């Protein structure tokens, strides 16, 4: 499998598609497809904040990559008519970096921190007073000359996004008034996203083609958009005016994306679990080592979708393959073996 195949189902953004994602992003809640429960709740919170002429409460968005956390943050800013400043946990290395960002904010602005779980502890602690009471105290100087400088801040909204909510400290997590767990998208929503994206691309797609794309996109909008771009290439070269189910199937087979959206890494994981560990239980570190990945990649990029479609289970003793996984791989299943 070459590098391109490995990237095709990566739910994290690829460098050369970041600009194209901007053209696909909805601007307002009414345009945002999926995550209905979250949208319904946000609609109430946004309306109430605007009626009171207050900044929206701080928001934590968590869930697997590619589900639209950054997009939703931008939508929230648009709905509030607020300016948004975007950064990431790894980009804020020192407390001074954070203070500089906070000092640029005006009343009602939004600060979006992606990968907020990767903030250094010292930086995170500065956020506590900023979020709760809208001020920061910074100690300058050393020894007898050390003194604190008090920086009042305007009311602002912090939106944090993370794929690893469990890695957030309790004090930080508790300061978010709005917490939204973003779920994998059902096929019906992904089909709508595929149709919307095709329209933006001025590309014709049949309902059957959109449905097949949706089924093989791992419940992830970013992936359905990426696959649509690749399938569009195959259709164009083949001289097809409309993307139908057959074109999608032929293209994705060539890209090593199977009927359930699994790639070679997923299949290697399942085959290792079934053949080498007799279906499990097996520890994630052992599985990751056997398939040549690190455990963080396996936990963040491989296992969430396999759990979602019911191909594996997490147990106190480790990962286990389910009967559905055996059936998908066409391996005889024996009760009690896994």
Swiss-Prot record:
Small ATPAse domain (RuvB-S) as annotated region, ranges: 186-256
Domain of life, source organism: Bacteria
Location of region: Large ATPase domain (RuvB-L): 4-185
Residues that hold DNA according to the record: 314, 319
Enzyme class: hydrolase
Entry's transmembrane regions: none
Gene Ontology MF annotations: ATP binding; ATP hydrolysis activity; four-way junction DNA binding; four-way junction helicase activity
CDD domains, per the entry: AAA (cd00009)
Intracellular or extracellular location(s): Cytoplasm
EC number: 3.6.4.-
Positions contributing to Mg(2+) binding: 70
InterPro entries: AAA+_ATPase, AAA_lid_4, DNA_helicase_Holl-junc_RuvB, P-loop_NTPase, RuvB-like_N, RuvB_C, WH-like_DNA-bd_sf, WH_DNA-bd_sf
Annotated segments matching region Head domain (RuvB-H): 259-338
GO cellular component: cytoplasm; Holliday junction resolvase complex
Biological process according to GO: DNA recombination; DNA repair
Keywords associated with the record: ATP-binding, Cytoplasm, DNA damage, DNA recombination, DNA repair, DNA-binding, Hydrolase, Nucleotide-binding
Function, in words: The RuvA-RuvB-RuvC complex processes Holliday junction (HJ) DNA during genetic recombination and DNA repair, while the RuvA-RuvB complex plays an important role in the rescue of blocked DNA replication forks via replication fork reversal (RFR). RuvA specifically binds to HJ cruciform DNA, conferring on it an open structure. The RuvB hexamer acts as an ATP-dependent pump, pulling dsDNA into and through the RuvAB complex. RuvB forms 2 homohexamers on either side of HJ DNA bound by 1 or 2 RuvA tetramers; 4 subunits per hexamer contact DNA at a time.
UniProt-listed HAMAP family: DNA_HJ_migration_RuvB
Domain notes: Has 3 domains, the large (RuvB-L) and small ATPase (RuvB-S) domains and the C-terminal head (RuvB-H) domain. The head domain binds DNA, while the ATPase domains jointly bind ATP, ADP or are empty depending on the state of the subunit in the translocation cycle. During a single DNA translocation step the structure of each domain remains the same, but their relative positions change.
Complex and partners: Homohexamer. Forms an RuvA(8)-RuvB(12)-Holliday junction (HJ) complex. HJ DNA is sandwiched between 2 RuvA tetramers; dsDNA enters through RuvA and exits via RuvB. An RuvB hexamer assembles on each DNA strand where it exits the tetramer. Each RuvB hexamer is contacted by two RuvA subunits (via domain III) on 2 adjacent RuvB subunits; this complex drives branch migration. In the full resolvosome a probable DNA-RuvA(4)-RuvB(12)-RuvC(2) complex forms which resolves the HJ.
Protein name: Holliday junction branch migration complex subunit RuvB
Organism whose genome encodes this protein: Oenococcus oeni (strain ATCC BAA-331 / PSU-1)
């Amino acid at each position: 499998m070459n590098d391109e195949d490995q990237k095709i189902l990566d739910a994290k953004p690829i460098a050369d598609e970041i600009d194209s994602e901007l053209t696909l992003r909805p601007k307002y809640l009414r345009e945002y497809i999926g995550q209905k429960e979250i949208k319904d709740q946000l609609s109430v919170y946004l309306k109430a904040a605007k009626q009171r002429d207050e900044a929206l409460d701080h928001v934590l968005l968590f869930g697997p990559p590619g589900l639209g956390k950054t997009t939703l943050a931008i939508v929230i800013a648009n709905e509030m008519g607020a300016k948004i400043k975007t950064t990431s946990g790894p980009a804020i290395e020192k407390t001074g970096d954070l203070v500089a960002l906070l000092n640029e904010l005006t009343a009602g602005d939004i600060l979006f921190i992606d990968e907020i779980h990767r903030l250094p502890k010292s930086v995170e602690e500065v956020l506590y007073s900023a979020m709760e009471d809208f001020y920061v105290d910074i100690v300058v100087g050393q020894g007898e000359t050390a003194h604190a400088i008090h920086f009042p801040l305007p009311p602002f909204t912090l939106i944090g996004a993370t794929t690893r909510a469990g890695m957030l400290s309790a004090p930080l997590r508790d300061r978010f008034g709005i917490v939204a767990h973003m779920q994998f998208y059902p096929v019906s929503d992904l089909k709508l996203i595929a149709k919307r994206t095709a329209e933006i691309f001025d590309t014709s797609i049949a309902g059957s083609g959109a449905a097949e794309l949706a089924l093989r996109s791992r419940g992830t909008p970013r992936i359905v958009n990426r696959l649509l771009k690749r399938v569009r290439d195959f259709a164009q070269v083949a001289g097809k005016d409309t993307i139908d189910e057959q074109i999608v199937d032929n293209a994705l087979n060539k890209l090593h994306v199977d009927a359930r959206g699994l790639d070679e890494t997923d299949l290697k994981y399942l085959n290792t679990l079934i053949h080498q560990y007799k279906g499990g239980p097996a520890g994630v570190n052992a599985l990751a080592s056997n398939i040549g990945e690190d455990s963080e990649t396996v936990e963040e990029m491989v296992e969430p979708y396999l759990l979602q479609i019911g191909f594996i289970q997490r147990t106190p003793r480790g990962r286990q393959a389910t009967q559905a996984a055996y059936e998908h791989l066409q391996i005889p299943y024996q009760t009690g073996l896994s």
